[in-house]
Amino acid sequence: MKILVVDDEQDICEILQFNLETEGYEVDTANSAEEAMMKPLENYDLIMLDVMMGEMSGFQMARKLKDNANTADLPIIFITALDDEDNTAKGLNLGGDDYISKPLSIKEVKARVRAVLRRTTQHNKQVDDNTDY
């Protein structure tokens, strides 16, 4: 499974990359939404996306992903210090699959990543099982 971590804090990217790689995931990082948008996003199984970044926010990037047919079904976990009800609801309403508040608990991050990927994998299997060939 391939994960892209997008956060303007390099330390967060490195911590998440190290810990998720120890779980067996292949992890790439980007320090801005603009940098992330230049990657072949359809090749990832999950995007972990900081909300507050420079030019383009995580919410803006999520909107672009959901508006593109190639990335519309890509799961998103928002990571943010904006730990309030309005921002959580906004992220989920934009198509986010989960919302994790900073400071991060690595144990919680790993569990949430597993849960989102498990749901996505099960959904994709159901779609495949229901497809007539």
Region locations from a protein language model:
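Short, Lys/Arg-enriched segments at the junction into DNA-binding effector domains
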Residues: 2, 118-133
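Active-site residues of response regulator receiver
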Residues: 7, 50, 80
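Two-component/phosphorelay signaling modules centered on CheY-like receiver
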Residues: 10-28
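Short hydrophobic/Thr-rich beta-strand motif most characteristic of the beta2 strand and flanking loop
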Residues: 24-31, 35, 39
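Active-site beta3 strand of CheY-like receiver
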Residues: 43-49
